[in-house]
Amino acid sequence: MAAPSPAGGAPSHAQSSLPSLPAHLQSDTHLTAHLASRFHVGLPTARLSSQALISLNTYTTSTKGPDGGKEGSAMGEAEDLAKRAFTRLGARGENQAVVFLGESGSGKTTIRSHLLSAFLSFSSTPLSSKLSYAAFLFDTLTTTKSLTTQTASKAGLFLELQYDGSSSVNPTLIGGKIIDHRLERSRITSVPTGERSFHVLYYLLAGTSPAEKAHLGFDKAVHVSTSSGAIGHKRWRYLGHPTQLKVGVNDVEGFQHFKTALRKLEFPRSEIAEICQILATILHIGQLEFASGQATTTHAEESGGYSHEGGETVTIVKNKDVLSIIAAFLGLSVEDLENSFGYRTKTIHRERVTVMLDPKGARQNADELARTIYSLLVAYVIEAVNQRICAAEDSVANTISIVDFPGFAQACATGSTLDQLFNNAATELLYNFCLQSFFDRKADELEREEVSVPATSYFDNTDAVRGLLKHGNGLLSILDDQTRRGRTDNQLLESLRRRFENKNPTIIVEGSKRTSLISQNARSAFTVKHFAGEIDYSVNGLIEENGEFISGDLMRLMKSTKSDFVRELFGQAALQTVTHPKEKTAIMQAQVSSKPLRMPSMARRKTSPSSRLAFDAGDADEVESQAESIAKDSSSGRRKSAMLTSGIQGAAGQFLSSLDIVNKCLSSTNLNPYFIFCLKPNDRRIANQFDSKCVRAQVQMFGIAEISQRLRNADFSVFLPFAEFLGLAEIGNIVVGSDKEKAEVVLDEKRWPGNEARVGSTGVFLSERCWADLAKVGERVVPVYAADMSDEGGDGLLHPRSTGYGDSKVRLLNPADQSPGAFIYGDEAKQGYFGSRDLDGRSDAGNSAFNSGDMFRNHETREQMLEKGNEKKMEEVDDAPISGSRKRWIALVYLLTFYIPDFAIKLFGRIKRKDVRMAWREKFAINLIIWFSCGVAIFFIVAFPGLVCPTQHVYSAAELSSHNGKDGHSSFIAIRGVVFDLDKFMPGHYPHIVPESALKKYAGVDATGLFPVQVSALCQGKSGSVDPMVLLDYRPTNISGSATTISGTDTNSVYHDFRHFTNDSRPDWFYEQMVMLKANYLKGYVGYTPKYLNTLGKKSQSIGSINGKVYDLTSYIAGGRLTKAPPGETVPSDVDTDFMDNSVVSLFQSLPGQDLSKHWENLKIDPALRRRMQLCLDNLFFVGHVDTRNSAQCEFARYFILAISVLICSIIVFKFLAALQFGRKNVPENLDKFIICQVPAYTEDEESLRRAIDSMARMRYDDKRKLLVVICDGMIIGQGNDRPTPRIVLDILGVPESVDPEPLSFESLGEGQKQHNMGKVYSGLYEVQGHIVPFLVIVKVGKPSEVSRPGNRGKRDSQMVLMRFLNRVHYNLPMSPMELEMHHQIRNVIGVNPTFYEFILQVDADTVVAPDSATRMVAAFLNDTRLIGVCGETALTNAKNSAVTMIQVYEYYISHNLTKAFESLFGSVTCLPGCFTMYRIRSAETAKPLFVSKEVVDAYAEIRVDTLHMKNLLHLGEDRYLTTLLLKHHSKYKTKYISSAKAWTIAPESWTVFLSQRRRWINSTVHNLIELIPMQQLCGFCCFSMRFVVFVDLLSTVIQPVTLAYIIYLIYWLVKDTSTIPYTSLILLAAIYGLQALIFIIRRKWEMVGWMIVYLLALPVFSLALPLYSFWHMDDFTWGNTRIITGEKGRKVVISDEGKFDPASIPKKKWEEYQTELWEAQTSRDDRSEVSGISYGTKSYHPAQSEYGFPGSRPMSQLDLPRFGSRMSLAPSEMMSRHADMEMENLSHLPSDDAILAEIREILRTADLMSVTKKSIKLELERRFGVNLDLKRPYINSATEAVLAGAL
């Protein structure tokens, strides 16, 4: 107000109104100085009349003035402004608005809270409390701590207080509304250094109880001790640096307030818990760690692996525990969630493409999920709050609006250019509105009323606002348009340059029109001259960021959620979805709305014509229509579903429309605006410091000096018509004259200054002060209700925030406590929206447990949620009969695994599904069988010979003599038939004085004579004792001549003679010595063969054997019994020397040299005597053991092993011979058979694909007779690729992007509805190095509903596309639309009848074939008409890339040249590798289908793959299974290998991929051979035929680990005992590898010598590690969700979560019918068939056809073939089918196709056909219709062609 200057004595700083300062002080510098003088005395505010407030942030308190009260403080001024606004609201019925302007850190949020507190204090309803909570929730969710402030707002706020019109004195508050604008989503995942993310995330982390932390997964945080010993915090990626967890914000208290606010706003407790879970989920998403891995597990939807054999590089989550927490809270399957991070589906060139992401891409995907969830949560909470506080629109009479957008951003802290641009655009608009309010609008009013005031110059930012925000061609509109059109960032830059260059000075795009690539990269930015300074905005990534599209993958994933709350989050109106035009249920992508869900209450009301400053009716209509559309969205509560062509807005378009509404609401006639300029006193956040330079810059920026000057000239805020003015003045009839004269009299009386009161032509202009004086508003009482007033519930009112950055202790229960609300506003002892009464002053029943205990107490546990999320919705799809063989196998499985209970598998194996547990049992049973087989093999190799012929440790006389210690031999010695190790004994011989040389002379001899024995000590005789004087003279005459014997007269014998007659009698000495020697030095026994014993018997030797022991009684019988008495004694006469029983002696005498065992048993003697006689025999007459080493059983054991070895050796020899017989190479003649060359492509790179395609195109085979067919499995961009695989293939083949055929339906291999697939067919000619080859490309694109991996079904499905097509061609069966199109392209375009093709060559996309390979294979087929399949030799191209590839080189070589060559001898190669094989399509003589016969195709197309056996057949080794099917169903035909056809492929380079590949091969081998063994007609001569080959292959696969064990056993044997060398085994090994070596030597493959050595070193890997790993991981699959369960009455039912497939959904018809319709359509001059559902193209046949079916004059390599002919469709479609993919525009303003066609005919009727062009026709049409027809260009072009060709 231009109040009078303060009294002369008053200091200058006492003047609060800047316009009241003298004119010489109205400059930026002087005003800044005045603000400084006020700031330094504690008055941080000033006024610009009554319309604006200037507030300086003191960084201390906002509640204390100079005297300690609130007078003069920011809070006091805010309350004063609120009081004035409220008064005007009541007195004049005007809407009020308070607009905040200021930089970040200037205290806007704080002043806003004071202002809201003041407004709410004028009402006594409980609604005031709710509005307070609502504002707090908004701040909690959208404010953060920045470098400049603790409370930086990061979302635009339009807060509306709603009043009814029942009282003109005190309007009643009836509701409120929070309208949020554009949350800074990028902050969630990108927290700037030194700043925080949104406060609520920190509250959650700090404020939850231990029990809640455990539930939310926060308890697993690892606390790391820092160097100072303090406990550091776990680093949360989304919370910035750990130091930001402790920055003076009371997060613990904040969380309690957060929960209290939600509860007071009537959020159910379960919902509060869900909200907390979602917030925790966001934090956990930030913790996910991604890594690259190999997809070594076969996926359920795969119909077979590619050449990389499951080695596809995929992205995996490393910390699965965190992943499971996220999955539980989102109600999702862990597996689905992990997979969703690894890929992203995009729309590129109107095609849906799945991009396989690397870990970096997966991180970005996870970040997008976090941003999306948080944005949706904020939208949900705000909308839920609005539903609780908003009044019915019709009951709202007036509103007070508080508008606070984030401050101007000089830089984008989070890296988001889009957020910075939106921020600054909004600030620019609000500042422009401020200028309009002070300058332009008032000038217009004054001019209308013929009041003249001096003009004031000011900085006008209208150019910037128009440049940024103008509809249609403003910067944001252009950005949105370019996003919608799918343009690039540089194209956007070029569009901006064209629009603004030399047209708008505020937007500068540097660079010329032809900017070079270097300069584009150097400066891809544009500059905007804002009122606050110039800002450069980078365009890099701006288009994509503006799209803000949520991928369809995420929407599809969330569709499967089991959480009702998450479903509600993703089902709200804030999420707009884009559905496919042809399938409304298929969500292509979605978008979180960047505009608010609600509109200002006044926005929908048209302003009355009588209002001042009315904007035009068009604006009103526009605002109304926007309001209605948004209201419709929010009221329905459903997602707004938009078609792909419906023009869904990008973020810029939405933000622009919301700003437009804000502007028009603020600019409406019945609204009075106030402005609060918030200034920073310095840039360093230092309390009570005033930086004049900093403040002056802000004063200049906001043009405060110009505004002040304007107010000095014209401070008019109220316009009163004369009648109203005079009524208020109450002058009655005192003054006579016109109303104008009366008004002038009143003004003269009032003596108001001229800048505050002027009379116009129809009324009076007044300032707010003058109006207040006139209307006596000072007499009105504005009630202010105490903060501790209770609401109806009795709770203390949560009063709006009353302090901002001060330390007022008002309303605190305990001044010592931390003030409620201080947690969010940074400084000490602060109070926020909450008064402390409410926090803990009184607890609601049960609330204490909720606040301090566990809010999840009655909630589902995380484990329950996870289990729920992993469940799939299943439905019955089919019956599943169980075969008899399957039942028998299951019985055997249970027999082998019955001891493992089901619950144990479920508990320890964590296998919940019954069918997967059954598979585990099957796997375990198979492993048991394999292990048993290995055990049997080991038994026969090692144990069987030992059982049949036990090992004997015996030495014949000759063998004993050889151990004489000479020539390196060991030294043995024999004593009484026992052989000892003399070498070992000699070092320990006692006494030591005897030299070893003296002992060595006894080596190799029988030294029994050296050891005389005491007979009485060793034998008890017949009676139980023998006289000690009896001696036995022992002479070992039986082995004389073989080994030297030592006689008893040897000089050394006296040292061992301790018999009774000696002086030193030791009866037991010999026995003790023998016990000691046997224990330490025993080597064996002297051996006597039965033959040698017989010989000795014939020589009158009394020798025989009993139970294997040999006894010699010759010396006893021959009188060797003596007696001798000790010295001095005589021998008694009655000494009996016959101590042996006569019957025993006579036994040896009568049967010398024989086995006496049975006779011994039959002797008629008592047991005691038998025991005594046995003792005497063992101690005195034992001479050795019977040597049975050459017996019959031992010979059998030896020759049995030899026979097996010979058998194996013979197989090896046969393999060798088989390899040799294929040595001759013949060069076949030129052949004229038609062949198809098929290449399945998945995610290979361009180099691999080009190599494969080029090698097939360059094959030396007639180009006309080969057809190159490439089948692309899905729209997928592999890791490392920049385009989807189909696009790479089409680019290689030269098909332009403009060619876009219609996708057509066909059957696929998949579960449920995935059996319905769609594909595009391209054809043309490929030209390379002089070869021109016709090609057909089939791209599987999937149904519109397929969001992730569209069209992808696996390699087997790719093979089936061609097999099923050829099958239907040969059987003349009805075909699917895509097959009809294939038939049409091959027959009518390429010009070959599909039945002509006889052979199909299947090559993988990473395989290169030799130029002559096809010729050699076809020659082999022609030579043998009984041949059905032929494979060639495959070598490696990456042999030296890694150790893993090096060990495979030799193995690849021998697997072909030995194994396959051997199998080929019998015409039964059991595995024709899919990477390089040719098949016979039909028989040569009868044209009977072979490869594509009904039986083979039906069996190979098996969809129900739900058992372990079928999984291994069809998911692991589909190539081998295809061979198995050919051998089963065409048993009279042969499969062969020819070494002359060569190809080169890429082997796995990493261990994981190699392991996965071999697991597939080994397991599929086992299961396929099991399939083959029961086959009939497989036996040949002596069974040496295919069945034998199959059995040998199966056995060798199963017992592979044993072969290595055997080799190790041999090595151990050799090392252990060098004396016995197993020559047979060594010869066998030498034969195995020697013959292999001979093969490559004969073929001069010298390099194979080195590779063979490498292979031998890797033998443990191939023979042991790989088989064992493979057998145990036989059930390692992703099992999918189709399974068999037991239904009613035991019926086996197939259930699936993919839905039931309806075969009728794919229409089929025979080729003849289709061809007839095609011909009729070509001749009927009609472009549509309403009956058949076939839409036709516009090109007719060319009369001059080449041999390919092409026009002869046209360049073949550039044919635009897909536009020719017909396109099948499920319904009649418009010509060219491209209208569905047009730009997303509203086509209603365009002329109809019929109208365009009529005009085209008219133009062509009169045009010169020699000069007319399509472009000229389009221009003429645009002239005639008066509209732009760019969107109709495809139709115009095609219709023009059709008219010219006569088709229309």
Swiss-Prot record:
EC number, as in UniProt: 2.4.1.16
Keywords, alphabetical: Actin-binding, ATP-binding, Cell membrane, Glycoprotein, Glycosyltransferase, Membrane, Motor protein, Myosin, Nucleotide-binding, Transferase, Transmembrane, Transmembrane helix
Location(s), subcellular: Cell membrane; Cell septum; Cell tip
Residues that, per the record, bind ATP: G102, E103, S104, G105, S106, G107, K108, T109
Membrane-spanning parts: 889-909, 928-948, 1200-1220, 1595-1615, 1621-1641, 1648-1668
Coiled coil: none
UniProt domain Cytochrome b5 heme-binding: residue ranges: 952-1040
Domain DEK-C: 1790-1845
Function according to Swiss-Prot or TrEMBL: Polymerizes chitin, a structural polymer of the cell wall and septum, by transferring the sugar moiety of UDP-GlcNAc to the non-reducing end of the growing chitin polymer. Important for hyphal growth and conidiophore development but not pathogenicity.
Family stated for the protein in its record: In the N-terminal section; belongs to the TRAFAC class myosin-kinesin ATPase superfamily. Myosin family.
Protein known as: Chitin synthase E
Taxonomic classification: Eukaryota, Fungi, Dikarya, Ascomycota, Pezizomycotina
